[in-house]
Design a protein with these regions (language model features):
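Active-site histidine-anchored catalytic micro-motif
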Residues: 1-140
Length: 140
């Protein structure tokens, strides 16, 4: 069985945004030599996410609005107990929990085996600093 690991470094200038990382994931799969297997992609930070959806700007705007309604940004310690530690990103932890940590995509004939419109996205909820994404490809 083959195993290939690579990392992306994300540095999103906005506090919350979504970045299509499908091309980088496809490149990692191609470089792995795996023809049949699995590709794990996960955010390696507790205020970031990796998820699969459509690359449609209106949908991304809807997500941002919806997430902000669920867990509004509020740096004060009143809303989020986490902010009582001196942090100001309690909302970002909640947003990550909703959007998830990772995705696993089948690799078939050396390519990501997506359904229609599916793309891999990095979700940033407390941006303006470097964070890593792990890409792990395993298989034959």
């Amino acid at each position: 069985m083959k195993s290939h690991t690579s990392y992306l470094t994300m540095n999103v200038p906005a506090r919350m945004d979504f970045v299509n990382i499908t091309p980088q994931v496809e490149q990692a799969v191609a470089g792995s030599g795996v023809k049949e297997g699995l590709c794990l992609v996960n955010a390696m930070h507790i205020t970031a996410s990796v998820f699969i959806n459509d690359d449609e700007p209106g949908l991304h705007d809807d997500y941002k609005r919806w997430l902000e309604q669920l867990a509004p940004y509020d740096p004060s310690p009143e809303r989020y107990h986490h902010n009582r530690t001196g942090e100001d990103n309690g909302d970002a932890h909640h947003k990550r929990q909703v959007m998830g940590r990772e995705v696993v995509v089948a690799v078939t004939k050396g390519r990501l085996d997506f359904g229609p419109w599916e793309q891999v996205f990095y979700g940033e909820f407390d941006g303006r600093r470097a964070k890593r994404v792990l890409i792990k490809v395993i298989g034959e």
